[in-house]
Amino acid sequence: MIPKIIHYCWFGRNPLPKSALRCIESWRKYFPDYEIKEWNEDNFDVEMMPFTQEAYKMRKFAFVSDVARFWILYHHGGLYFDTDVEVIRPMHDIVARGAFMGIEVECGNGLEYPYVAPGLGLGATPGMQFYRRILDHYSTQHFLDENGNQIPGTVVSHNTEVLREFGLQPHNDIQTVADITIYPIDYFNPLDDATGVLRKTQNTRSIHWYDKTWLDNYGPFRKWTTRIIHRYFGINSIAWIKHLFTK
């Protein structure tokens, strides 16, 4: 059984933004009997491995959270949400079925396997084999290369890579991998990040608002500008514009 606790991470010692507080309030609404626990520098060892140590030193706190969520759920179990996830419907049926994750990007159109994102929400019991494996995976990784530059890669790519080791199948329907139920995109990710279009269904339980706290101060402006361009001119339009002006 998944313990009745919701974990979230907030590193950097800045106050939580109003958007995060609204999301946390939605957790309280739909999980009234759950403890909600914040993890930060005071109760999580940011120097536990080179990846987290280097990310924290560079003030890339979202990448510290990428590892922390797996460590937390491996040792404690429970639910994990990023602070930009709003719960909009009851999830008790999903929690009752056991450990879960959700698809962020569907396979197809050249993508062989779906991308499964831990930022959409996680449910786990303590000591799950998958969580031990992904922690072992991260323990071999660095955040910075030998020149001090950030190494490309996201928690979604790392998560999906390890799920494939455990047998993730190339389809977008519900499947179970390593005792984890993987849910289709409409359950936890109805918002198209590229266009900002929201497509809720009767299955939708939560919305990931893509606050992108790891971006610089121009991040919100870039996010909304990019979505407008993608929505009206297509998702390949920005690449086309860049190509046009670099000929």
Model-derived segments and spans:
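Small-residue hinge/turn detector
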Residues: D66-G78
